[in-house]
Amino acid sequence: MSTTDELLKNAQAYAASFDKGELPLPPARKVAVVACMDARLNPYGLLGLREGDAHVIRNAGAVITEDEIRSLAISQRLLGT
C-alpha cells in the first residue's frame, strides 16, 4: 500500500469515528499558537493541549508572515483568542 493510500484510509477511518463535532469553534483555552512545521514536534503534547483547546498554526520556522498575521487576526477577532 502506498503512503497516499494509507493516509486516505486513515482519514476515512478518522472521519467515520469523529466525535469532536460538538466542540465549539472558538478554542477552549482561548489561545492561538504559531509553531514550526517540523514533523518531529507535537505542539499539542509539548504544551499539554487537547483537541479543541487552541488554534495551532504551523509553518517553516514558526515565522510570523502576512499569512500568519491573517490567521491570528481571524483567531483573535472572530474566535476570541
Which residues make up each language-model segment?
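N-terminal amphipathic/basic leader segments beginning at the initiator methionine
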Residues: 1-24
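Divalent metal-coordination and catalytic microenvironments
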Residues: 11, 33, 57
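Solvent-exposed alpha-helices and their adjacent loops that cap or buttress functional pockets
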Residues: 23-28, 47-49, 78
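A generic secondary-structure signal marking the coil-to-beta-strand transition
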Residues: 29-31, 53
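Short glycine-enriched loops at secondary-structure junctions
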Residues: 35-40, 62-63
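A short, structured beta-strand/loop element
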Residues: 43-44
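Short HxH-centered metal-ligating active-site micro-motif
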Residues: 50-81
